[in-house]
Structure formats: structure tokens, C-alpha cells
């Protein structure tokens, strides 16, 4: 009806070709991205890609039972998909939401480190795992005990009050 709302989520949702049958004035596009705004020091910013990979490693282990090596091995394919299906359309959004939390790397550390330490030296993903372990060494770990159940971080670490699959 006239007051119905259709929510389309996913990598193709900003692409107008996917919603060509909906008039432009009836669309409101929200782009959610994790844009890390922290620096390690005055000259070295934290790469957004590293923080996003850590999120994915933790989430894939918890939700899909995927080990860190497998997630790391798929990362370049994920990045190619973003380059083709997300980034060209991100400017088409009506509003952008940065989902990064200032404290998330301190929380993710406790979940990510054991997963990264499980990557063996003889695996091709070892160098990336070693790099991420060193990167996490810049942060003091923190308990997830005080992370609210409605926090977006719960999508990755579990314990959300929302059914996020």
C-alpha cells in the first residue's frame, strides 16, 4: 500500500538496476560502512580494511564456523566484490552511516587473537594472520560485558537482542 516500506539489504541494494521498477522519489538509500577513524600515532592511521577483516574473521567463526585462514583466503574475493558492486554506487546513497565504534578493536581483540593464532605457519594466510596479531598488539583488550545488546558490534561478537542470523 501507500504506507508500506520495503527494505533491501545487501551488496546490490544501492544499484539502481536492482530497483529500476521503484520510482526514484520513493527510494531512500542508506549506506552503512565501517570507516575507522583512529590513528596508531601522528603518522599512521588504522586501515579501515584491517578493522573490517577482523570483524569478518570474528563473525565468520561465530556464525558460519569458518576458521580464520579460510576467511583470510576469501578476503581478496570479498574486496573485488566491493569494488564491483558497492563502491561504484556508494555515492548514490541519501545518507551514510559509519558503523565503527571507537572501542571495537579492544573488544574484537579477545575474539580475533585465538582465531588468528590458529593459522599455521605452513598456510598461505599465515603472513596476514601474523600481521593482524601484531596490529592487535597496539590495543589493550577489553571485555564485551559492557557492550549493549543492541550494539552493532554484537552482529560480530554475538549476544545481540536482534535476530541477525
Regions found by a protein language model. Give the residues of each.
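Loop/turn-to-beta-strand initiation segments
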Residues: 2-6, 28
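Switch II (G3) loop of P-loop NTPases
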Residues: 6-12
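Conserved NTP phosphate-binding and transfer environment spanning the P-loop NTPase/kinase superfamily
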Residues: 13-165
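Alpha-helix C-terminal capping/helix-to-coil transition sites in glycosyltransferase folds
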Residues: 1-2, 92
Amino acid at each position: 500500500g501507500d504506507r508500506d516500506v520495503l527494505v533491501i539489504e545487501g551488496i546490490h541494494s544501492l544499484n539502481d538496476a536492482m530497483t529500476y521498477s521503484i520510482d526514484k522519489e520513493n527510494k531512500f538509500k542508506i549506506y552503512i560502512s565501517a570507516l575507522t577513524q583512529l590513528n596508531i600515532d601522528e603518522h599512521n592511521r588504522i586501515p579501515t580494511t584491517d578493522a573490517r577483516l577482523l570483524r569478518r574473521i570474528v563473525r565468520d567463526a561465530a556464525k558460519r564456523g569458518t576458521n580464520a585462514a579460510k576467511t583470510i583466503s576469501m578476503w581478496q574475493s570479498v574486496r573485488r566484490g566491493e569494488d564491483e558492486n558497492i563502491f561504484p554506487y556508494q555515492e548514490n546513497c541519501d545518507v551514510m552511516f559509519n558503523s565503527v565504534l571507537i572501542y571495537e578493536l579492544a573488544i574484537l581483540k579477545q575474539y580475533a587473537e585465538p582465531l588468528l593464532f590458529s593459522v599455521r605457519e605452513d598456510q598461505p594466510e599465515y603472513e596476514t594472520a601474523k600481521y593482524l596479531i601484531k596490529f592487535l598488539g597496539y590495543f589493550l583488550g577489553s571485555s564485551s560485558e559492557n557492550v549493549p545488546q543492541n550494539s552493532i558490534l554484537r552482529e560480530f561478537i554475538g549476544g545481540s537482542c536482534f535476530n541477525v542470523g
